[in-house]
Amino acid sequence: MHYPVRISNLLFSFIVFVLFFLIQSVNAQISLPEIPSKLTFCGEPVPLDDPDIKERLEKELIINMNKHASTILILKESGRWKSYLQAMLDSATVPQEFFYLAVIESELDPVSRSSAGATGLWHFKESTAKEYGLEISDYVDERRDAEKSTRATSVFLKRAYKKFGSWTLTAAAFNRGTTGIDNALKGQDTKSYYQLYLNEETARYVFRILALKLIMEDPGKYGYNLSPTDYYQPVKYETILINESIQDLPKFAKSLGVSYQTLKEHNPWIQNTDYKLVLTEGKEYKIRIPAKKN
């Protein structure tokens, strides 16, 4: 006669037990990000003692902590790109932390394109790209050449730093333009990015860089537990120098022992037009194909 009551009590206890662990699990998943007490960008302190600055950083951390698919892919792609891009920046005497600028611009996708038409790892617009010596034609788009676009980016950053004397303002200028930042500084009578009233995109820009820097330097702290084998590995390349146009790219690819798809994938600067490549006379270009395994 007492069994149904006992069974009910056991069932109720079991449900409470399950709900407790479900609640604990949800709480763990939606925990707020840890904000460091001190933070720098390229050696320049971020004024986190200002509640507004701390809040702006926290917002970007919350956004990027919860963009699960894109943040995981960024982390995985960093295994392929981080060392390469940081080495190029370092050789140009640009702080390695500007790697995170490429992260927020393109999510480390060399063929990504913004709604404004910017493309490549660093998302150059066409006019700026040409100003910094990158070729864009029906057949070539050097914004999608990792080496050449990183060199162009380094030139821009060094010029901007020479003008502003601040790497933080230099980062903002990459988004807003040097003239835009210069006008804002003069108009608002300040020398600090953190004191500027700016358009929303530029106002968030450095904070997005800082948020991705924090997450990527310690993914586990922000809920992303990747093992070393989860990261995409750098590709080892053989390089072929060319200075003449190619009339049949699939045939050319086959002569190199690769498919046209492989040629295009590893040379995204080649525009997808009628299977040929018309080059500027007297200029040398690099074709990269994956190195053959021994």
Kindly label every feature range from the protein language model.
Residues 116-138, 150-152, 157, 181-184:
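Substrate-binding/active-site groove segments that recognize
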Residues 67, 71-82, 91-94, 114-122, ...:
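Solvent-exposed, acidic/flexible segments
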Residues 94-111, 170-176, 213, 263-266:
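Short, functionally critical alpha-helical segments immediately adjacent to catalytic or ligand/cofactor-binding
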Residues 2-3, 7-9, 20-93:
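An acidic, Gly/Ser/Thr/Pro-rich helix-cap/linker signature
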Residues 266-294:
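Extracellular LysM carbohydrate-binding repeats and other cell-envelope/extracellular binding modules
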Residues 228-257:
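Primarily a LysM-type cell-wall glycan-binding module
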Residues 157-184:
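Catalytic and binding regions of secreted/periplasmic enzymes and modules that target cell-wall glycans
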Residues 200-223:
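Catalytic cores of secreted or luminal carbohydrate-active enzymes
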